[in-house]
Amino acid sequence: YYMQTTGNKRHALVMRAPNADLARDPRWGRTEESFGEDAFLTAQLTIASVRGLQGNHPRYWKTASLMKHFLANSNEDGRDSTSSDFDTRLFHEYYAYPFYKGITEGGSRAFMAAYNSWNGIPMSIHPCLEEITRKQWGNNGIICTDGGALKLLIEAHKSFPSFAEGAAAVVKATTGQFLDAYVPYVKEALEKGLLTEVDIDKAIRGNIFVALKLGLLDGDNSRNPYLSIGKNSTETPPFMTAEARRLAREVTAKSVVLLKNK
């Protein structure tokens, strides 16, 4: 809500955080924003992060917590196109566990699919997006691609010969948001019969659910208590209060871990 200022009157409705992927290689470029390689610890911190971002109002969220990057994307070399290969037990008990807990206990209803493949199928089109995260875990919200994923699907993974076919596969996987230019390709896929409007409706249903939780469809008489945060230019933002600053310092100090080579 720091964006609800006089110079920039809009708020961050979807926060692309936390990073619930497991950091197994320190060379990975996203290690600094992760919680480490321990699945249980990462799951617990993911739950806490999601709850903190979304708040405890019975109807509305402060912001939507969009976890990333689903999943097993912690190798640095070739992480935009390689395949992470492991069985379903490792999927459920290790790599997917923080995301599972973020949804079922934390209450997140949004995540970003990773660039890589799992067992040869790119995550942006993987059947597990619908079959596991939606049908088994109950994610009825947003699934989005990472930036450039559609292009990588064609040029790096070489899964499809055309962008229209790639876009159709992404939508059919119930992914409702692209972080790429996608409109021309989705339109082409629709015109060529690669997609139906039913497919599109199914994919974007979760976007509408999240919009409802954020009060975006309420109109002028919204009862969302969070919409007023930051509108009063004389009011101190919640994250800038003395208590918030004190807590941030305490958390930072207590999170430092010293390691000794022996």
Predicted regions and their residues:
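Glycoside hydrolase catalytic-domain context in secreted enzymes
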Residues: 1-262
